[in-house]
């Protein structure tokens, strides 16, 4: 996603900021003659970042956080989009003019961390100006996210950066975890999903259910080599955004090829943003259909039970 954003909105200018939901921003961006819409969601149940063609208008009265962003970066230029390691964090560095006409820089940081997801607005020194969600000391003993506090990334020192991990670090990390080797990989490396960890084991010919201690030194070395080959595609930007379907139901998505999904049908897309929108909108539609059918079954079952009881009473 970072690669895609750098290809599309780098050096582009923000033209509009809306806050359609309490935990969501829709940022309209112009790059030459092309208009992009960037959705930033810090939803606890479905945090997302992607480019979309669909517009989501904000409320008539903009929330305070939205008004603050409009004041500071309503016409800012996007200087960079970065990701620390492979953390689930995107940092947008923005350049704008202040009230005096001086050039200033700010950071908009999006953390995709489940129920702890947040969108945080900071100055260039990392001082928090405001955030879409305030986190007090009573809410979290790990980190406060409040205006005036210094921003820092939540502690992930127990995990290694897969882009820089050496063979010794990789093997030591998975040996330290007495669990299936695929789980040991994604538990030890930032940004590695269970699907990708399974794929690395599959490509290396390693039984993912075995522990690292069950593997010989040669096999562990081979596993590390396969891991580095896979990460090389990330370094080179060799992405193949795809969704894997079981019938009409989307089961998984990936920016990199997943060859062990033999039973699923693969559909490739132009961008990871298109993948994210298609995957989650389809899943939501199927979930709603399932819920409505379940509700309908409940109504029918209740009516049948009621009529059955009436029939039994009339038969006596």
List each model region and its residues.
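Extended, highly charged segments
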Residues: 1-316
């Amino acid at each position: 996603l970072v690669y895609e954003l750098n290809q599309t909105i780098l050096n582009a200018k923000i033209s509009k900021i809306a806050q359609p939901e309490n935990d969501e921003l829709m940022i309209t961006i112009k790059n030459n003659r092309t208009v992009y819409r960037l959705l930033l969601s810090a939803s606890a149940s479905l945090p997302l970042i992607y480019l979309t063609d669909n517009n989501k208008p904000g409320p008539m009265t903009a929330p305070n956080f939205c008004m603050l962003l409009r004041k500071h970066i309503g016409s800012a230029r996007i200087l960079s989009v970065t990701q620390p390691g492979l953390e689930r964090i995107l940092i947008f560095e923005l350049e704008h003019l202040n009230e005096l006409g001086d050039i200033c820089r700010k950071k908009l940081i999006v953390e995709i961390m489940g129920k702890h997801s947040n969108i945080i607005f900071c100055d260039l020194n990392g001082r928090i100006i405001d955030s879409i969600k305030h986190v007090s000391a009573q809410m979290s003993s790990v980190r406060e996210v409040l205006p005036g506090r210094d921003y820092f990334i939540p502690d992930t020192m127990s995990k290694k950066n897969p882009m820089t991990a050496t063979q010794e670090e990789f093997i030591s990390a998975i040996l330290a975890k007495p669990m299936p080797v695929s789980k040991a990989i994604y538990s030890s490396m930032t940004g590695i999903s269970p699907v990708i960890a399974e794929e690395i084991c599959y490509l290396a010919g390693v039984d993912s259910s075995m522990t690292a201690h069950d593997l010989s030194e040669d096999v562990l070395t081979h596993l590390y080599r396969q891991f580095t080959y896979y990460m090389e595609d990330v370094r080179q930007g060799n992405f193949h955004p795809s969704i894997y379907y079981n019938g009409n139901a989307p089961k998984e998505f990936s920016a990199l090829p997943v060859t062990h999904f033999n039973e699923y049908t693969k559909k490739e897309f132009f961008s990871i943003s298109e993948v994210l929108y298609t995957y989650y909108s389809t899943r939501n539609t199927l979930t709603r259909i399932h819920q409505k059918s379940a509700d309908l079954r409940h109504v029918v079952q209740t009516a049948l039970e009621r009529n059955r009881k009436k029939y039994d009473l009339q038969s006596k």
